[in-house]
Amino acid sequence: MAAVTAAAVSTSAAAAVTKASPSPAHCFLPCPPRTRAAHQRGLLLRAQVSTTDAAAVAAAPAKKEKISKKHDEGVVTNKYRPKEPYVGKCLLNTKITADDAPGETWHMVFSTEGEIPYREGQSIGVIADGVDKNGKPHKLRLYSIASSALGDFGDSKTVSLCVKRLVYTNDQGEIVKGVCSNFLCDLKPGSDVKITGPVGKEMLMPKDPNANIIMLATGTGIAPFRSFLWKMFFEKYDDYKFNGLAWLFLGVPTSSSLLYKEEFDKMKAKAPENFRVDYAVSREQTNAQGEKMYIQTRMAEYKEELWELLKKDNTYVYMCGLKGMEKGIDDIMVSLAAKDGIDWADYKKQLKKGEQWNVEVY
């Protein structure tokens, strides 16, 4: 499973942060300096686009260099390890898919008492109770964090997960249950849970409050993006006010499998100019050609707009979910890049170096 966390918040920082009012104060951070990768990518773009496009790129305003999110000294990793995990309590565990959905997904909240300082985009590990068939403790499983650094209760003392119960039939016709996912989905409030981490820097949010952030998720891959979006639209900070574009694409099999839709509806109503969301419901929707509506199919409807955004130094793409989504998205980008005479594989490498293409699939 993919992994993700939220920010370590010091006592003074926590005091400076409150839940958002209907009209939060506008606070802007300076735009960060340009990385070498961004510079190289600019050269690549200039060398390969048509004369018209090259002129447009050359005329674009100069960007300041970006500060790498991975070099932030405040990001904590591996505070708790498997041999000495943190033991939290389950405070809440709720099924968030409808009864007729193909599979169960649960949203759960654990107490941390502020001892697991995480950031949006990180993950935690969970060790299920009991032992394996060899009599040894179960190995940890990583899960993307689904809450902002403040947590669902806004006090920086909880962490939330979004977990799908794994149940399948093997080649021998036996029903197999995933050890950790079933342990988590069966947790009752008050139960202990062993937690490790936080871990990961790949999926950390960009610091630029004016960034364009494109989020591509399938199923429980929505977890890190819920953490992003809560920070952007449900919370108020003295030093951060999101004023860019957050564009979410979420792919699920059925409408009864849509996760956190009510929350996203509220965000859309609150910030219609800053938040867009498009769903791809593969078993219920088709495109104009009658093809099933997968996430890449939905993205294809906006491909020119997405490509124009990808040419900008302040656009960041995050992908989380099933590994199969990656190829379909690459196929779209290959054809779009080719129209501008750009090799997508090379261009994607430059995006990755500039921390503008971030992938966590499983």
Swiss-Prot record:
Q: What EC number(s) is this enzyme filed under?
A: 1.18.1.2
Q: Subunit info?
A: Heterodimer with LFNR2. Component of high molecular weight thylakoid LFNRs-containing protein complexes containing LIR1, LFNR1, LFNR2, TIC62 and TROL proteins. Interacts directly with LFNR1 and LFNR2; LIR1 increases the affinity of LFNR1 and LFNR2 for TIC62 and subsequent thylakoid relocalization.
GO BP: any one term: photosynthesis
User: Which cysteines are disulphide-bonded?
Assistant: 180-185
Write down the InterPro entries for this protein, in alphabetical order. Answer: FAD-bd_FR_type, Flavoprot_Pyr_Nucl_cyt_Rdtase, FNR, FNR_nucleotide-bd, FNR_plant_Cyanobacteria, OxRdtase_FAD/NAD-bd, Riboflavin_synthase-like_b-brl
Keywords in UniProt for this one? Chloroplast, Disulfide bond, Electron transport, FAD, Flavoprotein, Membrane, NADP, Oxidoreductase, Phosphoprotein, Photosynthesis, Plastid, Thylakoid, Transit peptide, Transport
Q: Does the keyword NADP apply?
A: yes
Transit peptide residues according to the UniProt entry? 1-36
Domain FAD-binding FR-type: where? 83-205
Record organism = Oryza sativa subsp. indica (Rice)
Q: What family does the database annotate? A: Belongs to the ferredoxin--NADP reductase type 1 family.
Q: Where in the cell is it found?
A: Plastid, Chloroplast stroma; Plastid, Chloroplast thylakoid membrane
Q: Which GO terms describe its cellular component?
A: chloroplast stroma; chloroplast thylakoid membrane protein complex
Q: What does this protein do?
A: Plays a key role in regulating the relative amounts of cyclic and non-cyclic electron flow to meet the demands of the plant for ATP and reducing power.
State the annotated membrane topology for this chain: Peripheral membrane protein
What positions are modified (Phosphoserine)? 181
Q: What is this protein called?
A: Ferredoxin--NADP reductase, leaf isozyme 1, chloroplastic
What Pfam families does this protein map onto?
A: NAD_binding_1
Q: Please tell me where FAD binds in this chain.
A: 141-144, 162-164, 168, 179-181, 220
> Which residues of this UniProt protein bind NADP(+)?
144, 164, 220, 252-253, 282-283, 292, 321-322, 360
* Gene Ontology molecular function, alphabetical: ferredoxin-NADP+ reductase activity
What PTM annotation applies here? Answer: May form interchain disulfide bonds with LIR1.
**Cofactor entry:** FAD
Associated pathway: Energy metabolism; photosynthesis
Per its record, the protein catalyses: 2 reduced [2Fe-2S]-[ferredoxin] + NADP(+) + H(+) = 2 oxidized [2Fe-2S]-[ferredoxin] + NADPH
